[in-house]
Amino acid sequence: MSDSVYQAANNRYTCGMDYRRAGKSSILLPAISLGLWHNFGDVDSLARSKDKLHYAFDHGITHFDLANNYGPSAGSAEETFGKIMKTSFAPYRDELFVSTKAGHDMWPGPYGTWGSRKHLTASLNQSLKRMNLDYVDIFYSHRYDPETPLEETLQTLVDIVRQGKALYVGISKYPPEAARKAYAYLKDHDVICLLYQGRYNLLNREPEEQGILQQAAENGSGFVAFSPLAQGLLTNRYLKGIPEDSRIARGGFLKKEALTEDLLQKIIRLDRLACERGQSLAEMSLAWLLAHPLVTSVIVGASSVEQLADNLKALENISFSQEEQQTIQAILQ
């Protein structure tokens, strides 16, 4: 990484990135966005984080997705982004679309989690300070809170927009009935619910099965997919066993029990199809999501610049023949 002043690539908007409209709004988002859930915390190299963020923006990624608890440790991904915002991205602030969220465990006590007015307001104030920002482009309710009146959560989102702390709001991982109420409430209060963010990949089809994709579209909202590679399962990482440095080997979110023999055989067959298409399994998995007309953007993580570059190759072929789609369906039955 050079210590020289960062200058964004002149061809960043002509290097192959596709920009898609978020629902019925005026906002265009890159087909691939960069998420900072892991690999950007205080346990990671600031220099490597800077290189990845620079590479992303230089290649047309304008949307950076964060949350208050991203790291590890919680809050450190926003601090990392804030440092890079100050040293590199400040001249380009108006070209960036920055999101953050609140709703998961963040600090001790009864006000450090879920969807109360107190938690959401305090959390966003903390996030803005960590990221060296006056406002975020979109602020999400990170998860539905069954214990807080939904109207309280939603009115807080409305007030956050009116206070100028966020330009837009969104919801993440809301069940369909709660999402229906959220869309209606926000519309009645003249605030755009710009995006629904949900887990969606070849192995998890809930947004289709539960009607979440269609519901978002009918309410004028875009859909952003996270975990598009199923935390690494939809890559070549596990085709020949479990590497010692993999997420499964380390434990945590992805358990060894998740990779059953049946699932492994499905992944192997998907990999063969990807090879026939001239793609890696990861590229095909991203391309499959991007082929869906109701998907606005797909959020990828990145442990390295090389991994991010590989993910961007998915944009080179997002077309699937009817036969290929049928083959995928047959594999995953």
Where are these regions (language model features)?
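Hydrophobic faces of well-ordered beta-strands that scaffold small-molecule active sites
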Residues: 30-34, 64-66, 96-100, 139-141, ...
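Short, acidic/polar
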Residues: 43-56, 115-131, 179-183
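Alpha-helix N-cap and loop-to-helix initiation/capping positions
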Residues: 44-48, 76, 80, 111-119, ...
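Structural motif
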Residues: 55, 59, 130-131, 164, ...
